[in-house]
Swiss-Prot record:
Signal peptide: none annotated. The lineage of its organism: Archaea, Thermoproteota, Thermoprotei, Sulfolobales, Sulfolobaceae. One of its GO terms (cellular component) is ribosome. Transmembrane segments: none annotated. PANTHER family: 40S RIBOSOMAL PROTEIN S6. One of its GO terms (biological process) is translation. The keyword Ribonucleoprotein applies. This is Small ribosomal subunit protein eS6. GO terms for molecular function: structural constituent of ribosome. Belongs to the eukaryotic ribosomal protein eS6 family. It comes from Saccharolobus solfataricus (strain ATCC 35092 / DSM 1617 / JCM 11322 / P2). Keywords: Ribonucleoprotein, Ribosomal protein.
Amino acid sequence: MPDFKIVISDPQSVEPKRIKVKVKASDQVKSITGEKDGKAVPQAKVNEKTKQLLNVDTLLTLEITKQEGDKKVKVKGHFKVDVDNSVPDNEVWISKTMAEKFGAEDFEAFAYRTKTLQISVDQNKATNLVGLKIGDVFEANQLIGLPVKLKITGGSDNSGFPMRFDVIGAAKRKILLSGPPGFYPNENGERRRKTIRGNTISQEIVQINTIIVR
């Protein structure tokens, strides 16, 4: 049974403020099983002043550019923010496990409010999602450790067929479409018969798109 890939978007993070910060691996930040593999949201500690400067609510992104051979590669990590006023201004503490992802335990990075992140969840641990529909809201804390509510906006199955909000049920169907999701017309009035999924999450769904609701 494949994992659910839950895509989380923050609708209030439109043009996030980017600030250069110092990042340190700290024993004060515990590693979480699965954080390096995208199966858990790692923790980052910042002080209240830095949190407000970044206009961060719950999630923070750190980004660096690394030289790999003749190419420059961006490395990003998304973190759940924990306020700790013992952390100096413009500094972020992360776990040693996440520091390995960036290739250093002491480095500079751009920090900003997270726009989108993806996390993989074992379907056996997320059985409460099966049967939910597009538009439903669920608590993310118990499932992925984030103290937020998530609203389901869509998704797709393991063949890439998208869920449609206006088709009842979980079954795969072939219907006539005039617009997305499932079909993007090139001309006004163009319609095509396409395969889609209904609006209900089943075990065949592999990606669930959500937004944070407040």
